[in-house]
Amino acid sequence: MGFDHRMETDQPPVVTATLLVPLQNGSCVEAAEALLPHGLMELHEEHSWMSNRTDLQYELNPGEVATASIFFGALWLFSIFGNSLVCLVIHRSRRTQSTTNYFVVSMACADLLISVASTPFVVLQFTTGRWTLGSAMCKVVRYFQYLTPGVQIYVLLSICIDRFYTIVYPLSFKVSREKAKRMIAASWILDAAFVTPVFFFYGSNWDSHCNYFLPPSWEGTAYTVIHFLVGFVIPSVLIILFYQKVIKYIWRIGTDGRTLRRTMNIVPRTKVKTVKMFLLLNLVFLFSWLPFHVAQLWHPHEQDYRKSSLVFTAVTWVSFSSSASKPTLYSIYNANFRRGMKETFCMSSMKCYRSNAYTITTSSRMAKRNYVGISEIPPVSRTITKDSIYDSFDREAREKKLAWPINSNPPNTFV
């Protein structure tokens, strides 16, 4: 009767405090659960789960935190420096801006965006063991973490389409500069709209934690599957199919036309090297971001803070490694990019050597002032009057001129 009387009076805090006292004793848990109403039981379960969450935030070893910080710091430096260098080198190539340059700059900007707007905050959460920037910032960080891979994979698909028509059907369709710009803009705008549900799924009820994974509800599961198919599986399959056709075409030309077309340049070697570079770039990107999507499909429950934190940090590090690997691949497989880096780091007091179509020996003071100097070989005495006519068709005679190229028009970076 006393219990019923207290329930009828408007004193819920007294009831809550009275009924939560037996919960401190393990032998009285069943009796307390029988007395607690359904709403108060849910309140107690949520309170105990959040308390366990707070306790588990301090279970990370200092060695784990230090190791993750070192690896993330190294990748962050490589990504910031490398992708900034890519943008700078291509910006200096003002003579002929190819469509490939636009795609490469777009991917470099996406890598810089995730390096600035997402990765530092993930490392901060891992090292401090809690989220101290609020729920709104949590949504923004997770949004950029979903935005950048979707943009990059569709830009890679655009590069694949460009390479396919450039090599297999060079006369039927051409990706011009305007088409490349529209393809890049469509990749950014459509993917930015596609990942907007992240703002509704992420965030938490308290300010000390930012959810790592999408919620295991049917809405979260449905969006995870749709995002995995549209943002990863479908473009990956299209990329594989296009490159398969390109490789088959190059292989067929190399085998069937070896005897009949030995002197004909059907597929330029530079384009074949570019295809190899982007093929390797696609493989690195797909294998780097696959663990992230698998972890999201797995939907691990975040009641074990240590496990979820380690899993999320590992898959984030693997996915972020693709941002640092792109400039490395450019410098290894593209001689023009290496030449552009040398020209970028070359100071006015240094001597720059270019392995270009020009024959360059040393950079004189006249060349440093962006003047073009031409020195001709003195003509040899002719005994036959027809030699002057033949010289106009003689390649060696026309190439006996030495010229310094103008620094304001450096060569194209990606061919």
Swiss-Prot record:
Gene3D superfamilies: Rhodopsin 7-helix transmembrane proteins (1.20.1070.10). It comes from the Eukaryota. Residues 1-69, 124-152, 204-221, 299-309 are extracellular. Residues 91-102, 174-182, 243-277, 333-415 are cytoplasmic. SUPFAM superfamilies: Family A G protein-coupled receptor-like. PROSITE patterns: G_PROTEIN_RECEP_F1_2 (PS50262). It is found in: Cell membrane. InterPro entries: GPCR_Rhodpsn, GPCR_Rhodpsn_7TM, GPR19_7tmA. It is a multi-pass membrane protein. Disulfide bonds join 138-210. One of its GO terms (biological process) is G protein-coupled receptor signaling pathway. It holds the Pfam family 7tm_1. Glycans are attached at residues 25, 52. Abundant expression in the brain. The keyword tRNA-binding does not apply. GO terms for cellular component: cilium; neuron projection; plasma membrane. The keyword Mitochondrion does not apply. Keywords: Cell membrane, Disulfide bond, G-protein coupled receptor, Glycoprotein, Membrane, Receptor, Transducer, Transmembrane, Transmembrane helix. The chain crosses the membrane at residues 70-90, 103-123, 153-173, 183-203, 222-242, 278-298, 310-332. GO terms for molecular function: G protein-coupled receptor activity. Belongs to the G-protein coupled receptor 1 family. G-protein coupled receptor that plays a role in the regulation of circadian rhythms and energy metabolism. Participates in maintaining proper circadian gene expression in the suprachiasmatic nucleus (SCN), the locus of the master circadian clock in the brain. May function as a coordinator of aging-associated metabolic dysfunction, stress response, DNA integrity management, and eventual senescence. Upon binding to adropin, modulates mitochondrial energy metabolism via the p44/42-PDK4 signaling pathway, influencing pyruvate dehydrogenase activity. PANTHER family: G-PROTEIN COUPLED RECEPTOR, G-PROTEIN COUPLED RECEPTOR 19-RELATED. This is Probable G-protein coupled receptor 19. It comes from Rattus norvegicus (Rat). The gene is Gpr19.
